[in-house]
Amino acid sequence: MTNKVRTRFAPSPTGYMHVGNLRTALYAYLIAKHDNGDFILRIEDTDQERLVEGALDVIYNTLKITGLSHDEGPDIGGPVGPYVQSERRNIYIEYAEKLIEKGEAYYCFCSKERLDMLRANSEALKRPFRYDKHCIDLSKEEIDKKIAEGVPYVIRQKNPTTGSTSFHDEIYGDISVDNSELDDMILIKSDGLPTYNFANVVDDHLMGITHVVRGSEYLSSSPKYNRLYEAFGWDVPIYVHCPPIMKDEHHKLSKRNGDASFEDLMAKGYLKEAILNYIALLGWNPGGEKEVFSMEELIEAFNYRNINKAPAVFDTKKLKWMNGEYIRALSLDKFHEMALPYYEEALTRDLDTKKISELLHTRVEVLNEIPEQLDFFNNLLEYSPKMYIHKKMKTTYENSLKSLEEVLPKLEALENWTFENIKEVCMNLVKELEVKNGVVLWPIRTAVSGKQFTPGGAFEIADILGKEETLERIKIGIDKLKALQ
């Protein structure tokens, strides 16, 4: 292998794309692309019981949607395949046997019952479970006999009980662990498949991975990884352990607890660019005030040494704000295209949706806010006459009624129903009555919408509703106000 930077994203196909997994993929991608390196996709499916049908498609689709394009992987191949761990079974067995020859691993024939008893004893003593090395000194004859008899076995790593193992992480610094704390972890399971930990080390070496990006929960396993690298005489890759993502101060974000996945966020109307931008900042500090980054800018700016140790809190409000920034940066045509499915779902009347998009483009932060802003376009909801009273607009029941009664015949006489003509009629009435704009415009907006807050003013709403519906709603407003007299 060359000195080229090579990173990997190695998910297990066990369900949705959790935000933490996506951040790992993003950081691995950014590290590789910052130095014109390779980003590899590897599928870790050694835990067959946890596999979920369709989850592999989720992984491929997410990488495709987000633009985190891999240079090598199961679907496109590459020079160091196969890229699916279950297809590499013989490779792992070969390397496990090399460790046995070196005296760095051993066969373990302990039954499930014996291991359960050891676990129960550990729990009773409130100690972490560690295998007691019962099989470590079996002779070759004993081993051959048991294998010939078909006794199930695993292959375990042989760790020392004295001294310490040290490793360096780019985020957490130098870490040293007493070897007495290291369990003789299983390398090859009784079904012949490797454990996650063993497969990782073998694959990362054989695939030339230079930077290993993963969550900080794997810090505790790193000494055992290092012992494997040393046993094989391999170079240790650069470790980049990322801090956990928290849903709040005390709870980690977790797909098992139903916290938002990438698919969930997309379904709620967040833009993929905003999600990636926000996730990039969960633990990484670019320095300076800038927070909105394109993918090209992220690739250029990303330095993994600026990742923080402190847990990052997933702040939905901040994500929402950032998504709003991205929506406002869209062209009107692009926003309209993205809004159309929401209009089809929410609107029951045939209206000019392009005009609605002009109103909403700068007023929504998440696309799924669109339907709640459209209800009054379908029909006039019941509202209280008190809405006509607005202190700032200086409106009362009396002057609101006067404004509506005065504007009604003028709008009825309007032959060409356009925004400009509606505006001209209303503003002429303001001059005619010698009042502030709000005295005329607030009652009209209230009458045509029945809402205190709308994504547009009186002119825009009347233009979109059309002449007949606008006049009908103004008449209803007049009746409401007359009923108070």
Swiss-Prot record:
Subunit structure: Monomer.
Residues annotated for Zn(2+) binding in this entry: 108, 110, 135, 137
EC number: 6.1.1.17
Subcellular location(s) of the protein: Cytoplasm
Gene (name only): gltX
Family to which the UniProt record says this protein belongs: Belongs to the class-I aminoacyl-tRNA synthetase family. Glutamate--tRNA ligase type 1 subfamily.
Organism: Clostridium botulinum (strain Okra / Type B1)
Reaction catalysis annotation: tRNA(Glu) + L-glutamate + ATP = L-glutamyl-tRNA(Glu) + AMP + diphosphate
Name of the protein in question: Glutamate--tRNA ligase
